[in-house]
Amino acid sequence: GMQHKYRETVLFFPTPGQTCHSYCTYCFRWAQFVGDQDLKFAARESDQLVRYLRRHREVSDVLITGGDPLVMKTRVLRRYVEPLLAPGLDAVTSIRLGTKAPAFWPHRFVTDDDADDLLRLFEEGLDAGKHLALMAHYSHPRELTTPAAEVALQRIQDAGATVRCQAPLIRHVNDDADAWADMWNTQIRLGAVPYLHVRGARHGTEALLRGAAGSRPATSRFRP
């Protein structure tokens, strides 16, 4: 249920968050969904994580991921986030949530019955001195332009969280410079941060040179 990925970064996979709003064919975490318990990362409680972090004070960054942790109700998510806010874990300065909820279900932050409690949890992280970020997956600019999506991003940021955006290159979806330039500029306009291209799955990938050729004109039109 836990992976010490880099010197400063630990990935944590809470069991209730090992599903998604939808399943992406390009996902490199396919092992979470195929029913093979020997391959799957999953942790029912956060006690093991807290003990590990107390022993490894070089870790400053915890990424809660899956699956998608925001399929969990806020009361369940709290069981995994609140222990990271407690005294004694001052070395942990960054808490990140890997999620596609802002694109697939922006109402999670707006009209869901526990949306306000979710935003209060973000505020509590800020009050505890943590940098809290949503690692949001957007694959096309249209995912950013619905009224619910725009309100969700505003509410997340008003609660003190940062939104960093990532996406893979997908054929017939965003494999041209216009899509990327539009997406990056829309993210900036809405206060989010274009962050990275996701890499990992080999099936269905675009040719590397094609992707690079498309990124250069998109970058030239990016207005940070």
Predicted feature descriptions by range:
Residues 40-44:
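Chitinase-like catalytic core of GlcNAc-active glycosidases
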Residues 11-13, 63-66:
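Short glycine-rich or small-residue beta-strand-to-loop segments that form or flank ligand, phosphate
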Residues 47-54, 61, 70-222:
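Conserved AdoMet/S-adenosylmethionine-binding subsite of the radical SAM
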Residues 29-39:
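Iron-sulfur (Fe-S) cluster-binding segments and ferredoxin-like electron-carrier domains
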Residues 14-15, 19-31:
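Local cysteine-cluster metal-coordination motifs and their immediate loop/turn environment
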Residues 11-16, 48-51:
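Short, charged beta->alpha transition segments
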Residues 1-12:
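N-terminal [4Fe-4S]-dependent radical SAM core
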